[in-house]
Amino acid sequence: MKFLDEAKVYVRSGDGGNGCVAFRREKFIEFGGPNGGNGGRGGDVVIEAVDGLNTLIDYRYQQHFKAQKGENGMGKDRHGAGGKSIVLKVPVGTQIFDEDRETLIHDFTAVGERFVLAEGGNGGFGNAHFKSPTNRAPRHANPGQPGEERWIWLRMKLIADAGLVGLPNAGKSTFLSKVSAAKPKIADYPFTTLHPQLGVVNADGREFVLADIPGLIEGAHEGAGLGDRFLGHVERCRVLLHLVDATCEHAGKAYKTVRHELEAYGGDLTDKIEIVALNKIDAVDPDELKKQRDRLKRAAKKTPILISGATGEGVKEALRKLADVVGEQPVSSKAKNAVESAATEEPWAAPVPPQG
């Protein structure tokens, strides 16, 4: 299943049905009076957060959604049936934005949460509604009210307890594959990870969900590399694990590069609890390791954990620190179910311009 975290869709609720002008016609009853029924109410456009989804790919191929129109009223005081509502299913963590892409309309945070995005139009009154002592035979009825229509943006942010950040090739995917059942693509070149990955981690009996996002490079907030758009998927995390490659030229500069991109992105990412780890310690000699550790300690103003995703050294300590921050709150079932789909190697699918 391809990963798509943003989509633009058009929605329109149903128009209300028209009221009916009709009169009672029976033998020997000369003035039967009005009996035109009311029109039915138009269907709503409803968005529902469901379990088991972790992509908006369905909205890449269909962008127009219209609810059913209410039926017209009929004679003999028969009211029109209401139009059928349409329900759009989205993953938990999806946000609805107005067409300007900035105005937040709703944020889905729980399975089963529903939001009426566009209400159907009310049905028009039939002529029986207008009968009064002074108007015994009204010959007019109301048309149904039109439904609402609008363009919206759906933006999904994965729900995870902890997030992995770092430069490309910092060893994030290797770390995730070692501590969970996730199977991300791993290779010795930058940007191996093209879309976020999720894994369920068990640290001393405490489970939490860990998210790995594509690596950041200098200028990512300006669109360099894969940009910083995937940082939205760690906005909901309670803690960040910042991995720095011990084999890079300068661990301190590598750390500051990522921190600068987090600050430029915003979203309070720099205010989150951060655990710093120097990775790939098995690939450098002791003297170089000490230099890199000291550089990273000065830049981060905290002592980094020394780990190796390949050998497993220091990994348990990092997981315990993450679990201590995450706490004992249970992992959402949505995040667990997303792991299998998130581990696929399908490329990220860019949103396509809506047709029509």
From Swiss-Prot:
Gene3D superfamilies referenced in this protein's UniProt entry, alphabetically: GTP1/OBG domain, P-loop containing nucleotide triphosphate hydrolases
Binding-site residues, Mg(2+): S173, T193
Name of a matching Pfam family: GTP1_OBG
Enzyme Commission no: 3.6.5.-
Keyword Cytoplasm: yes
Span of domain Obg: 1-159
InterPro entries, per the entry: G_OBG (IPR031167), GTP-bd (IPR006073), GTP-bd_Obg/CgtA (IPR014100), GTP1-OBG_CS (IPR006074), GTP1_OBG_dom (IPR006169), GTP1_OBG_dom_sf (IPR036726), OBG_GTPase (IPR045086), P-loop_NTPase (IPR027417)
Matching SUPFAM superfamilies: Obg GTP-binding protein N-terminal domain, P-loop containing nucleoside triphosphate hydrolases
Record's keyword terms, sorted: Cytoplasm, GTP-binding, Hydrolase, Magnesium, Metal-binding, Nucleotide-binding
Top-tier EC class: hydrolase
GO molecular-function term, one example from the UniProt record: GTP binding
Location of the OBG-type G domain: 160-327
GO cellular component: cytoplasm
Major site of localization recorded for this protein: cytoplasm
Location of the protein in the cell: Cytoplasm
Ligand binding (GTP): 166-173, 191-195, 212-215, 279-282, 308-310
Record-level GO BP terms: ribosome biogenesis
Function: An essential GTPase which binds GTP, GDP and possibly (p)ppGpp with moderate affinity, with high nucleotide exchange rates and a fairly low GTP hydrolysis rate. Plays a role in control of the cell cycle, stress response, ribosome biogenesis and in those bacteria that undergo differentiation, in morphogenesis control.
Cross-referenced HAMAP family: GTPase_Obg
Family, as annotated: Belongs to the TRAFAC class OBG-HflX-like GTPase superfamily. OBG GTPase family.
The protein, known as: GTPase Obg
